[in-house]
């Protein structure tokens, strides 16, 4: 199994390297000596201490900042941490706008209606607003709003294949029966984003372990470490020997470790918190999008209304 897993990772890395090595003419600024500064706001539902969802955004921000600096574009960030899906988000968007941000990025699905309230104000019409994982820009009448996501289902399918390989190995070794090949999936909400992800994951697992079944438990929050742990615990107690997640924290991984189950992760490498349980994970690499969006605004261009890339473009990566 280790040889097959290594081959899968090598193929994914090869695709990512090809993506990173290909640039279009717009990747090079007209003047390599530009030293201008652009101010960008980033509104986060959590903070980097979650070691998951928001931490992944911070990692993308840092990589994009470094790449842009090499092009002569300096980014000054205004970051608002721990802003809920409520009027805290509204106020954070206003604060970023009043502090002179030319581009404001909101990192949670539930931030969208509060971001739109600010983006629609006439005094902010020249500021660009991005809703990560959102969808309204395609149908609203605002020219300064944009959606951004990635084809994370691609990474979930690969992670599902790895989970299925482990389950089939356990069956072949007599550790479990075919009927005991049960996956538990901790989901935040029953939204299309989550459903498409666990569907891809299940199909990946079933492609190599035909007897696999899956139980899904929703926790009603993107980021509730306690409820995520409780859901993972309940799934293990219900007979699940493999745990995965579409939620923000590391607690499903640590609970899988505690319960003696395996785990495939999201947003970050989970081997540090669950070394015996963690097999593989997948995450969105936000650096390519941040670099593209910031450079476009800096150069006076127009950001795509809807942006979504995948493994081949380096926007979805696997973690171990």
Report residues per predicted region.
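Bacterial signal peptide processing site
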Residues: 21-23
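A residue-level marker of the well-folded mature domains of exported/periplasmic proteins
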Residues: 30-320
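Positively charged n-region of N-terminal signal peptides that target proteins for export
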Residues: 1-11
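C-terminal motif of bacterial Sec signal peptides marking the signal peptidase cleavage site
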Residues: 16-19
